[in-house]
Amino acid sequence: MEELVKQRQKLMPVRIQLSASFNQTATDFLRKQLGIKNSQIFPAKAPLDLSFVYGIQDVTREDTLLYPKRVPQNSPQVSETRPMLAQIKKQDILLHYPYQSIRPFLRLLQEAAEDETVLSIKITLYRVARNSQVIDALCRAAENGIRVLVLVELRARFDEENNIGWSRRLQRAGCEVIYGSRAFKVHSKLLLITQKSRTGVHYTTQIGTGNYNEKTSLLYTDLSLMTANQAIGAEAEKVFDALCADCLLYT
């Protein structure tokens, strides 16, 4: 995957985007040199790079120019004082991003990393935040002697380099890291926490539609279900077994 990322810098161009006032002679020269057809040339009247707008926003910072700030709310299902694992054992908790905060999920992961009854944490990762609390919690769990299995999908488009870096950090912390199958991308969002119990083991499962990413949870509409339903936990265990059996062939 690292080699493929490097090769991306040397791939053949597929289009030219330029200013509508760009010199026609220079345009023809570029088209011939790059082997581009006229249909692959896109003149634009607007600025090609709008990143300068962020600088203007920081300088002006006029509230009248900005949308009203929306802050994710705390879920009425969640107590701020009781442990998340205990709350989920009592009832399923469904979070709706970005209207509700991702904080209960982060608390679940952070508390599990410090819980002596937790035997293992298994999770699939596709895209995570730059300063990821999820990665921090997984590393902390591994350092505390908990078995942590992380399936990292390296082919998350344009996040390949980031995911390679996260994989190395997880491995240094003692996590078991496997990668996606050659046959398909692993795009599922699945977390399974296994605890010791009087009768054997107890599963706590999280299933969601959105990435484990604190930043994008503020923007994208997604659902996140946290449940202690043991049938769902057993199914999640089978999913991880199947993914591991397939992915280990290529890891």
What is each stretch, according to the model?
Residues 1-249:
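N-terminal localization/anchoring segments of enzymes in phospholipid and broader phosphate metabolism
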